[in-house]
């Protein structure tokens, strides 16, 4: 069985796979100081609660938070007796190497999304991931990651408004009833929601124009569904894209004898 771990700035997600069969997902908030023992206590408690029988033999990790990788490595080694693959490290092979400026460090989550998009849908794609940051990743015809765009995330933008302007409250993102808000909360929600609709449309249009071709747009991430239900912005919606990408990269390494 494979344990795939996606550690982002906000949440850490564990996904368990038996071959190609998905079994379950466990989610917790990301804490920089969480120990290997604490990970195991949380993990084993939930596995027991849900009545899931597991026999983990392999672990793969993608983390945008470098500080947590060490303890996740210890967790995998101590409790499952395996050396985990860590996306972005030299010993973790990618199906296709990224084509970006020499010396550029590409976020592992972006490499994982590119691998998943190509495996499921082929090349010539734009992947929009609504996470702590909103990222746009361009996947070439052969599956290579060739660059993209990083914009502030939706919730990050709302939080910045609240933190920087004393009179503005903390609000949650939602589709407003109208563009013109009649109270402060509605005005903030309208600005962020419709602002991001415009941002996605404009950036995707400019990427297509720069590459001089039409491209399918794939959406993933926690808030993608909100925008997909409200506006026709995407051709494909994949809520499990990143986790699928981790299984793709693990399979590639398995086939090449690195695990």
Swiss-Prot record:
UniProt EC number: 2.7.1.33
Keyword Nucleotide-binding among record annotations: yes
Cofactor note: A monovalent cation. Ammonium or potassium.
Record carries keyword Cell inner membrane: no
Compartments in which it is found: Cytoplasm
Binding site for K(+): 129
One Gene Ontology molecular-function label: pantothenate kinase activity
Gene Ontology CC entries for this record: cytoplasm
Stated family: Belongs to the type III pantothenate kinase family.
Gene: coaX
Binding residues for substrate: 107-110, 184
UniProt protein name: Type III pantothenate kinase
Pfam families: Pan_kinase
Subunit comment: Homodimer.
Listed pathway(s): Cofactor biosynthesis; coenzyme A biosynthesis; CoA from (R)-pantothenate: step 1/5
Function field: Catalyzes the phosphorylation of pantothenate (Pan), the first step in CoA biosynthesis.
Cofactor or coenzyme needed: NH4(+); K(+)
Reaction catalyzed: (R)-pantothenate + ATP = (R)-4'-phosphopantothenate + ADP + H(+)
Biological processes annotated in GO: coenzyme A biosynthetic process
Record keywords: ATP-binding, Coenzyme A biosynthesis, Cytoplasm, Kinase, Metal-binding, Nucleotide-binding, Potassium, Transferase
Residues at the active site: 109
Organism: Ruegeria pomeroyi (strain ATCC 700808 / DSM 15171 / DSS-3) (Silicibacter pomeroyi)
Residues annotated as binding ATP: 6-13, 132
């Amino acid at each position: 069985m494979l344990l795939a771990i996606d550690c982002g700035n906000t949440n850490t997600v564990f996904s368990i796979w038996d071959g190609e069969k998905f079994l379950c997902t466990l989610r917790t908030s990301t804490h920089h100081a969480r120990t290997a023992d604490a990970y195991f206590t949380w993990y084993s408690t939930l596995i027991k609660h849900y009545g899931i029988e597991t026999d983990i033999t392999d672990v793969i990790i993608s983390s945008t938070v470098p500080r947590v990788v060490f303890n996740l490595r210890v967790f995998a080694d101590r409790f499952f007796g395996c050396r985990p693959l860590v996306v972005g490290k030299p010993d973790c092979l990618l199906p296709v190497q990224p084509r970006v400026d020499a010396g550029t460090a590409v976020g592992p989550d972006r490499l994982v999304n590119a691998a998943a998009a190509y495996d499921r849908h082929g090349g010539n794609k734009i992947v929009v991931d609504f996470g702590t940051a909103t990222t746009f990743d361009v996947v070439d015809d052969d599956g290579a990651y060739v660059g993209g765009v990083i914009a502030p995330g939706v919730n990050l933008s709302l939080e910045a408004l609240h933190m920087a302007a004393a009179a503005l409250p903390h609000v949650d993102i939602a589709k407003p009833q109208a563009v013109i808000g009649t109270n402060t909360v509605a005005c903030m929600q309208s600005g962020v929601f419709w602002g991001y609709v415009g941002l996605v449309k404009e950036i995707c249009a400019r990427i297509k124009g720069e590459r001089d071709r039409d491209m399918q747009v794939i959406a993933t991430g926690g808030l993608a569904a909100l925008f997909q239900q409200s506006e026709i912005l995407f051709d494909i919606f994949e809520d499990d894209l990143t986790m699928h990408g981790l299984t793709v990269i693990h399979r590639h390494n398995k086939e090449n004898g690195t695990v």
